[in-house]
């Protein structure tokens, strides 16, 4: 209790500052939502641009009664994709910078507090790693709330951690299922492109034949976009989980730490496999016009690399607060 009063006096924390903390956290979450939306929009625009380019090449050699009108629509779609893609990319960067700013502001307010000295060195990592930006902001907000209100409910925290872990595993299994859809066909690039699907023929009511390369490209691009989404969702969920695991050193949370640690290792391996396979698929395309369709594959490989970086940091954090527990024991 004396420690809480000391921290309260050193910071001169007023009750009104709770609203400021909440507003900063809400802003951080909103920026994260915009970050996720811009990332998904950029991926889908890249897929749309690639597909319509390929579709226009197909129309040039096809026999369609409305070829001129359809080609005009395709060109409009390509133009819209070319205009919106840099806009969403700039918004994505601005959201990322906003998250860094909020993270820095919260840590700047707490720089004189002894309770937060150990977390300051992770601020630099948060500039490069998306996972830690959200984690640090949530951690700081929780510690400030505990300073203002000593009546924290440990059982509520435990229940929240349980639900976050369940959500983490659910999203992870969705990612595994999407990966299974990609690697179910043969391992050659040609087999991946000719998936014998008539999805586009049904959706566009177009004369595309079943098994046409555009079907395979669009379907694979759609799966890759959803895999990018699951990666981002995993980063957000793991941020909340890390906040709980770093904040508490209770023995009852050891099982959650082990589960999260081994799952992180598994996703690390999956991310490495995804990176290698996406790059191989991307650069194994032989046709000249296929180079227009490499953006989704390359973007997914970058997301896989980001995943590996964040999970390596997760492992370092895991080792860090387990070393503290061993020293205390």
Swiss-Prot record:
Gene Ontology, cellular component aspect: plasma membrane
Topology term for the membrane: Multi-pass membrane protein
Coiled-coil ranges from the UniProt annotation: none
Subcellular location: Cell membrane
Transmembrane segments: 29-49, 78-98, 120-140, 164-184, 217-237, 260-280, 299-319
Superkingdom field: Bacteria
Alphabetized UniProt keyword annotations: Cell membrane, Membrane, Transmembrane, Transmembrane helix
Main subcellular location of this protein, as a coarse class: membrane
Similarity remark: To M.pneumoniae MPN_129.
Record protein name field: Uncharacterized protein MPN_090
């Amino acid at each position: 209790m004396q420690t809480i009063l000391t921290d309260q006096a050193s910071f001169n924390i007023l009750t009104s500052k709770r609203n400021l903390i909440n507003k900063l956290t809400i802003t951080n979450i909103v920026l994260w939502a915009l970050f996720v939306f811009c990332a998904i929009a950029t991926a889908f625009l890249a897929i749309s641009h690639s597909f319509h380019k390929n579709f226009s090449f197909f129309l040039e050699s096809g026999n369609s009664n409305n070829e001129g009108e359809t080609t005009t629509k395709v060109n409009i779609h390509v133009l819209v994709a070319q205009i919106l893609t840099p806009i969403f990319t700039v918004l994505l960067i601005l959201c990322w910078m906003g998250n860094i700013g909020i993270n820095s502001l919260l840590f700047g307010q707490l720089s004189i507090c002894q309770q937060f000295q150990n977390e300051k060195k992770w601020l630099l990592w948060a500039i490069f790693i998306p996972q830690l930006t959200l984690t640090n902001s949530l951690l700081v907000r929780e510690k400030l709330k505990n300073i203002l209100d000593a009546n924290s409910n440990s059982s509520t925290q435990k229940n929240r951690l349980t639900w976050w872990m369940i959500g983490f595993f659910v999203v992870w299994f969705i990612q595994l299922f999407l990966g299974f859809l990609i690697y179910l066909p043969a391992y050659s690039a040609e087999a991946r492109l000719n998936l014998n699907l008539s999805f586009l023929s049904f959706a566009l009511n177009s004369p595309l034949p079943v098994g046409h390369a555009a079907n395979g490209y669009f379907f694979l691009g759609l799966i890759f976009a959803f895999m990018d989404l699951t990666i981002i969702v995993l980063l957000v969920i793991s941020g909340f989980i890390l906040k709980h695991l770093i904040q508490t050193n209770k023995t009852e949370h050891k099982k959650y730490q082990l589960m999260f640690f081994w799952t992180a290792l598994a996703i690390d391996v999956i991310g490495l496999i995804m990176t290698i396979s996406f790059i191989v698929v991307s650069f194994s395309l032989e046709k000249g016009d296929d180079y227009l369709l490499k953006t989704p594959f390359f973007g997914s490989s970058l997301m896989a690399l980001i995943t590996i970086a964040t999970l390596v940091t997760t492992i370092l954090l895991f080792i860090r607060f387990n070393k503290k527990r061993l020293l205390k024991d």
